[in-house]
Amino acid sequence: MIFQNTLEFAQQLDNQDELKEYKNEFIFPQHEGKNVIYFTGNSLGLQPKSARNYVDEVMNDWANLAVEGHFYADKPWWDYQERFANPLSKIVGAKPLEVTVMNTLTVNLHLLMVSFYRPTKKRYKIICEEKAFPSDQYMFQSQVNFHGYKPEDAIVEIKRREGEHNIRLEDILSKIEAVGDELALVLFGGVNYYTGQVFDMKTITEAGHKQGAKVGFDLAHAAGNIKLELHDWNVDFAAWCSYKYMNSGPGNASGCFVHEKHHSDSNLPRFAGWWGHNKERRFKMEPTFDPVHGADGWQISNLPILSLAPYLASVEMFAEVGIEKLIRKRNQITAYLEFILHEIDKEVKGHFEILTPTNQEERACQLSVFLHGEGRSLFDYLMKNGVVTDWREPNVIRLAPVPLYCSFEDMYNFGQILKKGILEN
């Protein structure tokens, strides 16, 4: 398709958009009586209008049933997480018994590393991406320290080549091969939070397994954003947060994936708690742990139902829409945003460059724009003019045109505001 930088063309794309009605299913912050242009679904998704009803349902059950709500609520609390199995499995490409909801993202990665990072004197190294999200970096360092190794030796970061913004797949694969039988774990982000680069998880998993290592992924910026096939890719484990593209609310519960090949491995260590115990015998208060078969067996504590309620509202919307439709629009609207940025660059050369790969297979719903010069003033200008973007040091504005609630007209209007902001700043 040949794009045009006109309001009429953007509105034409909106008229053809198969997801256009979903924009009305979300609540937008307001600027001068109008919806803001919201580009920060990669940080915190908007609130679905249905979320309040799901929360109110739990509040009413709590008020009217109190403790009996565990078994007699409309959606009984004791097995509330089971409602997530089917929709989440479709979002991440898994079998329903391979996914669960619990805790928050870094907590879950720590718990999964109990099972899948089992260093020995010979095999103890972790391979990760350079400039992973800081919480992952702290996790790696603390895990390595806990096991008695030195981070500068045990953590191997794959770096970008000089003058390049993204990590080459060939460099990842060659490093995995070079570390070889010293490699205990490969743990990458599915999508790099800073650049928006999508990693080839299937190929990375195959390479890690070839060296005898376990392979996992932090899917914070991938779940609900890209096509995932965790089961078929043979990924050992993964975790994600739900408050970005999955719109569950600030700091809300995480999700986990554990491949079914590990479910019956009695030698696999894990930290245990009563909510991971055999569901049929959970309330018999037995002294010996008998894990639930499947990813639910990694649960530890009773689940926060009030937090899960808006999460359930969101995943049920995802089930209604389907990941294929989301990806079709994501590709088109991200490409249109990229086109708008290039059109502006023709007029105001040298003010910015896009760090994110141009190849659609290597990016998702994010364009990271590096600003030359004093970028913070431009960011502030956008915010003051009703464009909510995300600032990341050094000098990057991240733009996430989330397909469920961003429109093509939003992209056009953003371009007009951005151009004016550059010229005025």
UniProtKB/Swiss-Prot annotation:
A GO molecular function for this record? pyridoxal phosphate binding
Under which pathway is this protein filed?
Amino-acid degradation; L-kynurenine degradation; L-alanine and anthranilate from L-kynurenine: step 1/1; Cofactor biosynthesis; NAD(+) biosynthesis; quinolinate from L-kynurenine: step 2/3
Reactions it catalyzes: L-kynurenine + H2O = anthranilate + L-alanine + H(+); 3-hydroxy-L-kynurenine + H2O = 3-hydroxyanthranilate + L-alanine + H(+)
Q: Which Pfam families match?
A: Aminotran_5 (PF00266), KYNU_C (PF22580)
UniProt modified residues of type N6-(pyridoxal phosphate)lysine: 244
What EC number(s) does the entry state?
3.7.1.3
Gene Ontology CC terms, in alphabetical order: cytoplasm
Q: Which cofactor does it need?
A: pyridoxal 5'-phosphate
* Residues annotated to bind pyridoxal 5'-phosphate: 105-106, 133-136, 218, 221, 243, 274, 302
Keyword list, A-Z? Hydrolase, Pyridine nucleotide biosynthesis, Pyridoxal phosphate
UniProt superkingdom: Bacteria
The Gene Ontology biological process annotation of the record reads: anthranilate metabolic process; L-kynurenine catabolic process; L-tryptophan catabolic process to kynurenine; NAD biosynthetic process; quinolinate biosynthetic process
Report the sequence similarity comment from the record.
Belongs to the kynureninase family.
Q: How does it assemble?
A: Homodimer.
What does the UniProt function comment say about this protein? Catalyzes the cleavage of L-kynurenine (L-Kyn) and L-3-hydroxykynurenine (L-3OHKyn) into anthranilic acid (AA) and 3-hydroxyanthranilic acid (3-OHAA), respectively.
Instruction: Supply the name of the protein.
Output: Kynureninase
